[in-house]
Amino acid sequence: MFMINIISLIIPILLAVAFLTLVERKVLGYMQLRKGPNIVGPYGLLQPIADAVKLFTKEPLRPLTSSTTMFIMAPILALTLALTMWVPLPMPYPLINMNLGVLFMLAMSSLAVYSILWSGWASNSKYALIGALRAVAQTISYEVTLAIILLSVLLMNGSFTLSTLIITQEHLWLIFPAWPLAMMWFISTLAETNRAPFDLTEGESELVSGFNVEYAAGPFAMFFLAEYANIIMMNIFTTLLFFGAFHNPYMPELYVVNFTVKTLALTILFLWIRASYPRFRYDQLMHLLWKNFLPLTLALCMWHVTLPIISASIPPQT
């Protein structure tokens, strides 16, 4: 029975990821005053299926000098971790209701760094290695602010359980009292998922395509799926933290619709940002984090800790 539950979570995620690629190409197309894919199937709806078939039927080439085991393990690990992070998400009921769901997701996103590092190192190519090192430095750096922002939000929530965030936001979305945090959180999620304008790892002019430059066919598709699954997952996380969807136990369908619409809006915003902004320079990226975001988030975290104490009460504990 548990296996059926897992499969019923994984298959919709993979389908969502497949069609997100189509949405991205369509949105970018219309933003550049062109149509986007519209040949394969009605309105190009079968394009993701054609892409998947094309990728998985190609020969998985491997460089002679690469480390075989690690080279194959890296994309598998990336996809596994990307799918594992969906387990504690309440939609409205999680697959596994964890007490420390937020901590679990933070730990999983930190582990994803290893798959990038392994892929860059195992490829035995200098482009891949430079791309991987950039990606790792960027991901680790932005995780610092993500963790501090999470801590500040959870002080208002009172526990590390994701389900309590829904109850906390029944009357007021947390984006209103914590809008500076929400702003920094959103920019940090862009950097965390290696999206434009922070897609330094894929600097085409200097690194071809970053850490996955030596990958082809199936393993490349796995990295691709992992990246897009992480994008949707981060947007779901943002929705849970700041745009709490109202949950009526008698009508869970309403929650699902509410939740999906907010997640979709954030995902379209990701694509809109990609179409609008040029890529950052590497030093600007690091400067933004260590000199701007980190002091601000630390100050706001202290503010969130001291405010309840000043007003003669302790933070909520559930």
UniProtKB/Swiss-Prot annotation:
Hydrolase in keyword set: no
Native source species: Halichoerus grypus (Gray seal)
Protein name stated in the entry: NADH-ubiquinone oxidoreductase chain 1
Function recorded in the entry: Core subunit of the mitochondrial membrane respiratory chain NADH dehydrogenase (Complex I) which catalyzes electron transfer from NADH through the respiratory chain, using ubiquinone as an electron acceptor. Essential for the catalytic activity and assembly of complex I.
A biological process term (GO) from this entry: mitochondrial electron transport, NADH to ubiquinone
EC number: 7.1.1.2
PANTHER family: NADH DEHYDROGENASE SUBUNIT 1 (PTHR11432), NADH-UBIQUINONE OXIDOREDUCTASE CHAIN 1 (PTHR11432:SF3)
Quaternary structure annotation from Swiss-Prot or TrEMBL: Core subunit of respiratory chain NADH dehydrogenase (Complex I) which is composed of 45 different subunits.
